[in-house]
Amino acid sequence: MYRDWLMRGKSQNKLRLFVQAAFCALSNGYVLGFSRKEIFEGATKYICAPGLNCYSCPAAVFSCPIGSLQAVLSSRDYKISLYVIGLLTVFGVFLGRAVCGFLCPFGLLQDLLFKIPFAKKIRRLPKDGALRYLRFFILGVFVILLPLFVVDITGLGEPWFCKWICPAGTLGGGIPLVLLNSAMRGAAGFIFRWKIVILALTLLLSVVIYRPFCRYVCPLGAIYGVFNKISFYRFKVDEEKCTKCGACQKTCKLDIPVWRNPNSADCIRCGECKAICPHSAISVGI
């Protein structure tokens, strides 16, 4: 019977990987951008992708929701701000952090890196509980407050998260543009090198610990996590079937006690707990 549960978990992983890869390809369909050394500026760029996908990636056909939110907050265009916030709310209400589990290209990259064999994988970092609040701090300070209140003489702010932190932007936008554009290579300075360090640390940690960026840093995950308890797509635990055996938490790479908190703000809805539950106590509720 355990083998059956294990096979169900593997099938769930394959399905999720297929959806992730398909959406990553859809979000980055302008492959000519690399050969033409340009950023796509078609009509779809007015639409935000649900996951973290850099606007400046030459292949990207959608905008990044976090980049867009910073841009509109710093520009004082509140009508567009309401559009971006409304779009994030729609994604959150319907899917919650299922966006992170199925529709985020940078999440896919971390999933693939974690599959690389390593001598000792880590379940959590020291002070894990406190570190999980870091993404809310980054959301509040770097995505909202700094772009809104730290402005130049014209009243415009900067995209602080994109400029100083975002490893997805460095990988998808910064590195390709610097490699493809000689003028940008000459202009790349301290900030670019700083972000290379952040990217390198994120990628290396992703081999050892599951989704460190999503778990501790991502402000988009912080937004969607708030919706997990109220989103249409959420998990339910049948208390009559559940024996609190802990199989769900043991299989959860984010170390969530699903039996106690099935709609944790940390849950990315990968579905492995549901597939592995020996009592079929976990279900998807709408």
For the regions a protein language model found, what residue spans apply to each?
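Non-ligating segments of multi-cofactor redox enzymes
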Residues: 1-255, 265-286
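Donor-sugar nucleotide-binding helix/loop cap in glycosyltransferases
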Residues: 260
